[in-house]
Amino acid sequence: MMVTSASKRILLIDDEPDVQRVVQTCLEKLAQWTVITATSAEEGLLKAIAEQPDVILLDIMMPKMDGYMFLDALWVKPEMQFIPVVFLTAQAGLLKPHHYETLGVKGIIAKPFDPLTLHRAIASALNWDLGT
């Protein structure tokens, strides 16, 4: 069963335009979610505060401010502490579940990714039952 909700907003923070296009297309077609994009962690932080997304998809390796620095900056703001974050990264094989869970991250998706895996990880972060 596919979970759909036009009201869900996903903030994608990734410095690669091709990744942004693929993720946006997948999520808008598969789940009819709205995808807000940011090409840097700094821009993502501003958009997270302004948009209050339902989930943040976050790349780890970015110039200037990486994904870990973004989390530090995001979670010092009390109103942002409850937004689920899912890593979308080429470094997935280097991270163990206990590592990202201690950071407060709800999941990790390896690049390249399968669209259904992407959808399931976000749905899981939203605590939705996919009925699989």
Show which residues each predicted segment covers.
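Two-component/phosphorelay signaling modules centered on CheY-like receiver
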Residues: 17-36
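Alpha4 helix (beta4-alpha4-beta5 surface) of REC/receiver domains from two-component response regulators
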Residues: 69, 92-109, 120-123
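Short amphipathic alpha-helix used as the core "switch/output" element in two-component signaling
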Residues: 46, 68-81
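Non-catalytic signal-transmission and effector/linker regions of two-component phosphorelay proteins
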Residues: 1-9, 116-132
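Receiver (REC) domain active-site loop signature in two-component systems and cognate sites
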Residues: 62
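Helix N-cap/capping motif at the beta->alpha junctions
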Residues: 37-46, 67
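Active-site beta3 strand of CheY-like receiver
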Residues: 51-57
